[in-house]
């Protein structure tokens, strides 16, 4: 949801298939092409993000490409801050990541995390991306709420 994309449309609830009960945003063409990425609210009210690793997510060595993990982390910033955003427009101001372990084709890649602080315009988030083998990446980032950009006709 980087780049001032519209969170205002709200996430779509998926009703069928592997991702039934999960949500996704349809308003970010890059993430739709890169993922698709999903999130849901857990029983304890926390947010969990996930996607299924495919061949197109791998690098030449057969491991998940670091750029894919960073893109998923960027998605997770917005999913983890979903409630604080309240359908506002926002952009990623910073995103830091530490790569810890690999993922392979077919893995379920998940993320959990938390909002560290939410102010009027800035939201600070941290999380961990993992698969069944353990942690893959830790990350932290900052989201800034912005006004939607006017469309020029």
Regions found by a protein language model. Give the residues of each.
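Terminal targeting signals and extreme-terminal segments of soluble enzymes
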Residues: 1-153
């Amino acid at each position: 949801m980087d780049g001032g994309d519209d969170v205002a449309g709200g996430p779509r609830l998926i009703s069928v298939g592997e991702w039934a009960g999960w949500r996704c945003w349809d308003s970010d063409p890059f993430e739709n092409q890169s993922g698709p990425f999903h999130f849901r609210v857990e029983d304890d009210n926390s947010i969990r993000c996930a996607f299924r690793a495919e061949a197109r997510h791998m690098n030449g060595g057969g491991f998940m490409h670091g750029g894919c993990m960073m893109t998923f982390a960027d998605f997770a910033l917005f999913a983890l801050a979903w409630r604080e955003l309240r359908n506002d427009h926002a952009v990623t101001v910073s995103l830091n990541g530490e790569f810890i372990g690999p993922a392979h084709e077919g893995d379920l890649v998940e993320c959990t995390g938390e909002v560290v602080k939410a102010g009027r315009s800035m939201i600070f988030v941290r999380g961990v991306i993992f698969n069944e083998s353990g942690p893959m990446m830790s990350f932290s980032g900052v989201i800034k709420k912005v006004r939607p950009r006017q469309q020029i006709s």
